[in-house]
Amino acid sequence: MEERIHSLRVKDVQCDELWGYVGMKEKTKAKKGSDDATIGDAWTFVAIERYSKLVLAWHLGRRTERDTVAFTEKLAAATQGSFQVTTDGFAAYRDAVVLSLGAQGVDFAQLVKLYAANPESETRYSPAECIGCKKVPVFGSPDPKQISTSHVETHNLSMRMSMRRLTRLTNAFSKKWEKLYAMLALYFAHYNFCRVHQTLRVTPAIEAGISDHIWEIKELLVATA
């Protein structure tokens, strides 16, 4: 659906990553001595517009600098002009956002979570206790009052509730990388064009002005075929 979400004027974008895995967790993969690139931890990068709730870009990959740049390049293609963008504290965003979006004149900030103890990683079933957040301006002139990732984090919770393969503490997980990718592609297309947002009372696509009606499932499947 990338061709329908391209060069959009936006105001405020929030980015985050969602952890899952394919086949087995990265720790198990390491113990087995496997170098199979199609199994292990799988991170879904998500960019959502604060006001329209439209998912502007997403990317399935590893939590690396390379995949972070691939994600921010997709966000750059989906947008135009200046806007505010807030990410979590993942260090790779600092270079990736400036590299991909700096020429557009974005105002970039990070919301860094402070933990009671050093978190092992977001792959833990019981994350370390978050005791606060620190707003860190990185590039441009971000509005401190708008530095937030609450909307994208709420959306990521909805993703986990909607797709069993992303639900924690279950025996459900993706067995193949391409199956997870296909599921995510359908989810985001359905979310943007078919699913009426409870707050907006229309779909994000209608709110963003890229659709004039609520899509039926059949229409979505034909468009993505």
Predicted regions and their residues:
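Residue-level recognition of single "structural anchor" positions
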Residues: 1-225
